[in-house]
Swiss-Prot record:
Keyword Repeat included in the entry's annotation: yes
Positions of short motif NPA 2: 227-229
Family of this protein: Belongs to the MIP/aquaporin (TC 1.A.8) family. PIP (TC 1.A.8.11) subfamily.
Induction note: Circadian-regulation. Expression is higher during the light phase than during the dark phase. Down-regulated by chilling.
GO molecular function: water channel activity
Disulfide bonds: none
Organism encoding this protein: Oryza sativa subsp. japonica (Rice)
Membrane-traversing stretches: 37-57, 74-94, 125-145, 167-187, 199-219, 249-269
Name by which UniProt lists this protein: Aquaporin PIP2-5
Function: Water channel required to facilitate the transport of water across cell membrane. May play a role in root water uptake.
Annotated localization: Cell membrane
UniProt entry tagged with the keyword S-adenosyl-L-methionine: no
Motif (NPA 1): 106-108
Amino acid sequence: MGKEADVEAGGVRDYEDPPPAPLVDIDELGRWSLYRAVIAEFVATLLFLYVTVATVIGYKHQTDASASGDDAACGGVGVLGIAWAFGGMIFILVYCTAGISGGHINPAVTFGLFLARKVSLVRAILYIVAQCLGAVCGVALVKGFQSSFYDRYGGGANELAAGYSKGTGLAAEIIGTFVLVYTVFSATDPKRNARDSHVPVLAPLPIGFAVFMVHLATIPVTGTGINPARSLGAAVVYNNSKAWSDQWIFWVGPFIGAAIAALYHQIVLRASARGYGSFRSNA
């Protein structure tokens, strides 16, 4: 391989890209570190869904005129508060679990990192299973603690809003997930970490903020999925026909968005420098 164009003045890079993860690493199944990471993903996704869905249910109850009277219109945390709940929980949970599992908490993030060879197929599958189970358990806790409100206020399920086509909903999920996964790649880039020593500590902040911003943009359209586990967990517990009929949007969209983000970061942003370096070395 040729030298990269992003070398420092002395010709030596001040960062090192980690080697790609093996596609299938059977030996990984014998390591406790894998199962510890899977447990961390399960618990983190459970907590994420519990807090966020409880926030959604609470907001809808506080703004219900039949329950809160004339003050309902001014009650609750509002869409801004819901977006903060999602973004804030991602910030907290990524910070807590990044050193154990990488802090994915989202099958779309796991899928994007798998395409970029950051995690093996075995780890990716186990993570996604753990995330989905954690999401179901988290929403089930909300229903258990707020059974009188849960079904009445929609169970926190993602559904395409009235007036929007399925294509619009799909596009919203693709773009929203692209923003999130692109932020994940940028915040965890080893090149960035080498330049700014504080970046590893602050990495959860832009990731959480990306989730917050995407929610502001897409809550009116789809309720904001950008996380298939979040959408599946709510659909399983709520078990409503509308939530199930729209469920494919919240899997296809995020996986497409994650794939585009992975390809953009790995091929356009990072590999272009290597290609330019190879061209120069062969000139």
